[in-house]
Amino acid sequence: MEIIKPISTIIIGLFLSIEFSFSSETNLIFTPFFSSTYYSSGSVFQPEKDGKTTITYFQLGAKKNTGAWSISGRFQFITATNLDSNSAFFNPDFNFEHRRGFYGSDNTWFESSSLIINYRNSEKFSVFFGKDRVQWGAGRSNLILSNHCPTYPLASFDWKISEKLNLQYFIASLESQISDSSQNELYSGRDIYVDRSIAGHRLKYSLLDKLTLSAIETVVFGNRKFDEHYLLPFIPFWSMQHYTGDVDNVQMCGEISWIPKDELKIYTSIFIDEWRPESTFDEQNRNWIGYQIGLKKNNFLQYNNKLLIEYTWTDHRIYRHKFSENSSYTYNFPLGFWAGPHAEEFIIIFNQKLGDWNFQSNISQVKRGELTEEMLDRQYSDPVIVYERYNGNLETRMIISAKAKKGILKNKLFLELEGQWIDWKNAGFDPYDSGRMGKDISKFSINLGLTASTQILFN
């Protein structure tokens, strides 16, 4: 890791001095990016009271528009010191696809990439494919599809059917991280994973100018990349899965978004996993749900600020499936709410811009409980054996933070200073291992960040 420090210094110097532009036609834009943050007591990246953590990003992005086509992508390389990789599964701002270590060192590195190729021939219809995430919902961390998981290969379209009605569809390939022993033998013992895929469609209807209703349905299916039953975007997946033997994982979500006045949005959504309509009101039902309610307000009390207040709650029976290859995860990260099932979060985020300064303050209270195999077996038993919420080992964490950020040198360089107070009960908790106990810690972390970015334009 010693070599990274002089390299970082050189890169920052280049970013501050370079801004090329060749010719005046449509540009191919490259965006090199560097960021490094020091956490004095590890923040939420390691479940100890003491111990500094450093995370450094090297990234190269590119984009190009030509006619109806647009292409954008990025490659990202991350290095980290004193990072507990398990902490990423309880952190909304960090995820990874491929984790590696340096030889002769405990330090870690990760790499990831994304790409979107978009074709739009009119304001009413567009098609895109590549490697990215689908994010459906108005919230910070949506219940059914959020941006807190790693990217995945996908193909999608967006069709504005009328002024009030919009349809979106996608199909994607996920990473199950379930070893396929039959394939491993063919590749000299290397890990080859069972296929897992997802298809989804969303119908949005503008009931009034300020009221929007959304109906979302997804299906996660394993042991195959594609399934012709789910290539039909206009038919409910709940009905189509009967043709596959009712073995797949169908999930539904409804959302209401209301803008009662300018600069204010109120939203709420409900998520239902493996719904059985005929038993909805029975004692033995499958009302496995999650729900979310929140609001976003711009210019709260004064100008140039944003306020977000959000509460999210998830049942322990959602996302996971009787057949593990059909669970709603990729790289072991949930596709929806970042804390996963059997969890809840209340969060307030306030952003204020004052001149060249940006200030952000957060209050987050999050809790999550066990997700054992016994609990999974019990939810599918007949009759169902009821599990009392949080009846066992659990983890809670409160974070109160304040951050200041300032751009200098024409906003090519940003400096950040953040203070975090963290009260963490059962830190290091593993929801899949009921016998593993963590620590109760309270700590204050001072976080120092530096970010450099510029654009290089070609024609």
Regions found by a protein language model. Name each.
Residues 24-212, 223, 283-321, 325-342:
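Outer-membrane beta-barrel channel domains
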Residues 8-19:
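Bacterial N-terminal signal peptides
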Residues 17, 131-133, 400-402:
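An exposure/low-complexity boundary signal
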